[in-house]
Amino acid sequence: ILNDTLWKIHPSQVVVDSGRVDVNNFYFSHQDRYVRINGRLSENPKDTVKVDLKDINMGYVFDIASISDDVNFEGDATGTAYASGVFKKPIMNTRLFIKNFSLNHGRLGELDIYGEWDNENRGIRLDASIQDISPSPSRVTGIIYPLKPESGLDLNIEANELNLKFLEHYMKSIANDIKGRGTGKVHFYGKFKGLNLDGAVMTDASMNFDILNTHFAVKDTIHLAPTGLTFNNIHISDMEGHSGRMNGYLHFQHFKNLNYRFEIQANNMLVMNTKESTDMPFYGTVYGTGNVLL
């Protein structure tokens, strides 16, 4: 049983002898998903093992490794991995196609990835493209460090209309229902428990601010830094099409301990739409014109 799913282990042959392991058709499956392993594991760089995957959920790998609750990759991986000299100085590479690749429950698209093991840095170097709604794919290059205590990542992302839903996980203390797309260059790096973003993204998105129960749409460039997001005179609108301008910041430390200051120049915008609640001393529907400070 793996992650509450029953897998079938098929008959196979595994022989351990004189510092080497010969694997003949080690095969386990669940419905049409499977992992199949053939080859030899040893210190000899000429001895190679081959791993074939079909529709294996990436979430299994991260759950087994107990990497972090702050980053959650999902998607069904199909492809082949090769490894040689495993017991001394491993050389490993893989080519995978991952359907419905997602980060923190935000679907990013179809991922085509080439990866290889970097012995010196104890990480997986990757070169990947993500195909979604844009004719031009998003590109991801860099390295993932799966082994503790270094576990983390260092990725350069060239986003083309990339789904921004994954940010909802980090902003859930103040906002929800994040919808939209981003285009730009971003550096995504740090330990899994302390991730950072750095770059600039042209954003066409909306989100709901919990305390106001109001959706705002943003169509402008947002600047990202390890300390937070900066908004420089960006164009915003409410869901009824009334527009305004916003300056301010959303500060955080590794997406935690959020604090913010927004200065909004509103033109008859819906700035609050709350109902009676024991959590708030006031409620109502408010349209505002002028300067608003949040």
Give the predicted meaning of each segment.
Residues 290:
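Glycine/Thr-rich phosphate-binding loops that ligate phosphate moieties of nucleotide
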